Amino acid sequence: MPSATPTDIERRIGNHIAELIPDGATLQIGVGGIPNAVLAALTGHKHLGLHTEAMTDGVLPLLKSGVIDNSLKRVMPGVTVASLALGSRRLYDYMDYRKDLVMKDVAWTNDPFRIRENPRVMAINSAVEVDLTGQVCADSVGERIISGVGGQHDFMYGGALSEGGKTFIAIPSTTPKGESKIKALLTPGAGVVT
Protein backbone atom coordinates (compact mmCIF):
# COMPACT_ATOMS: atom_id res chain seq x y z
CA MET A 1 0.00 0.00 0.00
CA PRO A 2 1.63 3.27 -1.04
CA SER A 3 2.01 5.96 1.59
CA ALA A 4 -0.38 8.92 1.28
CA THR A 5 1.50 12.02 0.17
CA PRO A 6 0.34 15.03 2.22
CA THR A 7 -1.18 18.02 0.45
CA ASP A 8 -0.05 21.57 1.26
CA ILE A 9 -2.94 21.99 3.70
CA GLU A 10 -2.19 18.64 5.34
CA ARG A 11 1.47 19.66 5.74
CA ARG A 12 0.43 22.87 7.49
CA ILE A 13 -1.90 20.95 9.79
CA GLY A 14 0.89 18.44 10.46
CA ASN A 15 3.31 21.24 11.37
CA HIS A 16 0.81 22.71 13.85
CA ILE A 17 0.28 19.34 15.53
CA ALA A 18 4.03 18.59 15.66
CA GLU A 19 4.54 21.83 17.62
CA LEU A 20 2.22 20.43 20.32
CA ILE A 21 4.09 17.14 20.69
CA PRO A 22 6.76 17.14 23.41
CA ASP A 23 10.02 15.24 23.29
CA GLY A 24 9.58 11.86 24.97
CA ALA A 25 5.98 11.42 23.79
CA THR A 26 4.58 8.04 22.76
CA LEU A 27 2.90 8.23 19.37
CA GLN A 28 -0.14 6.54 17.94
CA ILE A 29 -0.44 7.51 14.31
CA GLY A 30 -3.45 6.92 12.10
CA VAL A 31 -3.31 6.37 8.36
CA GLY A 32 -3.37 9.07 5.67
CA GLY A 33 -1.95 12.39 4.59
CA ILE A 34 -2.27 14.27 7.89
CA PRO A 35 -0.67 11.55 10.05
CA ASN A 36 2.16 11.33 7.48
CA ALA A 37 2.54 15.12 7.57
CA VAL A 38 2.83 15.03 11.37
CA LEU A 39 5.52 12.35 11.16
CA ALA A 40 7.47 14.38 8.57
CA ALA A 41 7.40 17.39 10.92
CA LEU A 42 8.85 15.48 13.90
CA THR A 43 12.44 15.12 12.65
CA GLY A 44 13.76 17.57 15.27
CA HIS A 45 12.17 15.74 18.21
CA LYS A 46 13.94 13.38 20.62
CA HIS A 47 13.17 10.12 22.40
CA LEU A 48 9.76 9.51 20.85
CA GLY A 49 8.03 6.18 21.32
CA LEU A 50 5.69 4.30 19.00
CA HIS A 51 2.74 2.23 20.26
CA THR A 52 0.23 2.11 17.42
CA GLU A 53 -2.26 -0.09 15.66
CA ALA A 54 -1.03 0.54 12.10
CA MET A 55 2.63 0.99 11.21
CA THR A 56 3.18 2.81 7.89
CA ASP A 57 6.07 4.03 5.76
CA GLY A 58 5.78 7.44 7.43
CA VAL A 59 7.54 6.16 10.56
CA LEU A 60 10.63 4.88 8.72
CA PRO A 61 12.66 8.13 8.68
CA LEU A 62 12.03 8.63 12.41
CA LEU A 63 12.98 5.04 13.26
CA LYS A 64 16.10 5.04 11.08
CA SER A 65 17.30 8.41 12.44
CA GLY A 66 16.72 7.46 16.08
CA VAL A 67 14.04 10.10 16.70
CA ILE A 68 11.80 7.18 17.63
CA ASP A 69 13.90 5.21 20.11
CA ASN A 70 11.13 4.14 22.53
CA SER A 71 13.44 4.86 25.46
CA LEU A 72 10.88 6.64 27.65
CA LYS A 73 7.92 4.30 27.16
CA ARG A 74 6.66 2.37 30.18
CA VAL A 75 5.01 -0.39 28.14
CA MET A 76 7.77 -2.35 26.41
CA PRO A 77 10.50 0.32 26.66
CA GLY A 78 12.99 0.27 23.81
CA VAL A 79 10.53 -1.53 21.54
CA THR A 80 8.17 -0.30 18.82
CA VAL A 81 4.75 -1.92 19.22
CA ALA A 82 2.16 -2.28 16.44
CA SER A 83 -0.61 -4.64 15.35
CA LEU A 84 -0.39 -4.40 11.59
CA ALA A 85 1.71 -2.91 8.84
CA LEU A 86 0.40 -1.00 5.82
CA GLY A 87 3.15 0.06 3.51
CA SER A 88 5.68 -0.57 0.83
CA ARG A 89 8.26 -3.30 0.45
CA ARG A 90 10.69 -0.87 2.11
CA LEU A 91 8.63 -0.96 5.31
CA TYR A 92 8.38 -4.74 5.35
CA ASP A 93 12.11 -5.14 4.69
CA TYR A 94 12.87 -2.77 7.58
CA MET A 95 10.57 -4.72 9.90
CA ASP A 96 12.03 -8.13 9.05
CA TYR A 97 13.72 -9.84 12.04
CA ARG A 98 14.00 -6.72 14.21
CA LYS A 99 14.44 -7.22 17.94
CA ASP A 100 13.26 -3.65 18.62
CA LEU A 101 9.86 -4.20 16.96
CA VAL A 102 7.03 -6.37 18.26
CA MET A 103 3.76 -7.06 16.48
CA LYS A 104 0.97 -7.77 18.98
CA ASP A 105 -2.65 -8.72 18.45
CA VAL A 106 -5.03 -5.80 18.19
CA ALA A 107 -6.76 -6.61 21.49
CA TRP A 108 -3.43 -6.13 23.31
CA THR A 109 -2.18 -3.10 21.38
CA ASN A 110 -5.49 -1.24 21.41
CA ASP A 111 -6.37 -1.80 25.06
CA PRO A 112 -7.00 1.75 26.37
CA PHE A 113 -5.82 0.79 29.85
CA ARG A 114 -2.53 -0.47 28.44
CA ILE A 115 -2.20 2.59 26.18
CA ARG A 116 -2.62 4.92 29.16
CA GLU A 117 0.34 3.33 30.96
CA ASN A 118 2.69 5.15 28.60
CA PRO A 119 3.27 8.80 29.50
CA ARG A 120 2.44 11.60 27.06
CA VAL A 121 0.52 9.47 24.56
CA MET A 122 -0.18 11.54 21.45
CA ALA A 123 -3.04 9.90 19.52
CA ILE A 124 -3.10 11.49 16.05
CA ASN A 125 -5.95 10.59 13.72
CA SER A 126 -8.01 12.03 10.90
CA ALA A 127 -11.64 11.77 9.84
CA VAL A 128 -13.99 11.98 6.88
CA GLU A 129 -16.23 14.49 8.67
CA VAL A 130 -17.09 15.80 12.12
CA ASP A 131 -20.18 17.50 13.45
CA LEU A 132 -20.89 20.26 15.92
CA THR A 133 -21.92 17.76 18.60
CA GLY A 134 -18.40 16.29 18.53
CA GLN A 135 -19.21 13.12 16.60
CA VAL A 136 -16.43 11.85 14.33
CA CYS A 137 -16.93 9.75 11.21
CA ALA A 138 -13.69 8.19 10.00
CA ASP A 139 -14.72 5.12 8.05
CA SER A 140 -17.65 5.98 5.77
CA VAL A 141 -19.07 8.60 3.46
CA GLY A 142 -22.71 8.50 4.42
CA GLU A 143 -23.70 4.84 4.13
CA ARG A 144 -20.73 3.94 1.88
CA ILE A 145 -18.01 2.21 3.92
CA ILE A 146 -14.49 3.26 2.88
CA SER A 147 -12.46 1.45 5.55
CA GLY A 148 -12.93 -0.94 8.41
CA VAL A 149 -13.48 0.27 11.94
CA GLY A 150 -10.04 0.67 13.47
CA GLY A 151 -8.67 1.54 16.86
CA GLN A 152 -9.23 5.29 16.72
CA HIS A 153 -11.66 5.24 19.65
CA ASP A 154 -9.35 3.04 21.74
CA PHE A 155 -6.39 5.35 21.26
CA MET A 156 -8.41 8.52 21.76
CA TYR A 157 -9.64 7.10 25.07
CA GLY A 158 -6.25 5.72 26.16
CA GLY A 159 -4.46 8.91 25.09
CA ALA A 160 -6.88 11.06 27.07
CA LEU A 161 -6.21 8.92 30.17
CA SER A 162 -2.43 9.01 29.71
CA GLU A 163 -0.42 11.30 31.99
CA GLY A 164 0.29 14.37 29.82
CA GLY A 165 -1.51 12.75 26.88
CA LYS A 166 -3.20 14.60 24.03
CA THR A 167 -5.59 13.41 21.35
CA PHE A 168 -6.02 14.90 17.91
CA ILE A 169 -8.69 14.51 15.24
CA ALA A 170 -7.25 16.57 12.40
CA ILE A 171 -8.98 17.31 9.11
CA PRO A 172 -8.93 20.00 6.46
CA SER A 173 -12.10 22.08 6.83
CA THR A 174 -13.24 21.30 3.28
CA THR A 175 -13.08 18.50 0.73
CA PRO A 176 -11.12 19.01 -2.51
CA LYS A 177 -14.48 20.02 -4.05
CA GLY A 178 -14.91 22.78 -1.44
CA GLU A 179 -17.62 21.03 0.60
CA SER A 180 -17.41 21.49 4.36
CA LYS A 181 -16.16 18.53 6.41
CA ILE A 182 -17.50 20.20 9.56
CA LYS A 183 -21.27 19.75 9.64
CA ALA A 184 -24.17 20.60 11.92
CA LEU A 185 -24.92 16.85 11.93
CA LEU A 186 -23.07 13.99 10.28
CA THR A 187 -24.28 12.87 6.85
CA PRO A 188 -27.20 10.44 7.31
CA GLY A 189 -25.87 6.90 7.54
CA ALA A 190 -22.36 7.99 8.55
CA GLY A 191 -20.77 5.74 11.14
CA VAL A 192 -19.82 7.41 14.42
CA VAL A 193 -16.33 6.27 15.39
CA THR A 194 -15.35 8.68 18.13
What positions do the PLM features span?
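Conserved phosphate- and dinucleotide-binding cores of soluble alpha/beta proteins
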Residues: 1-194
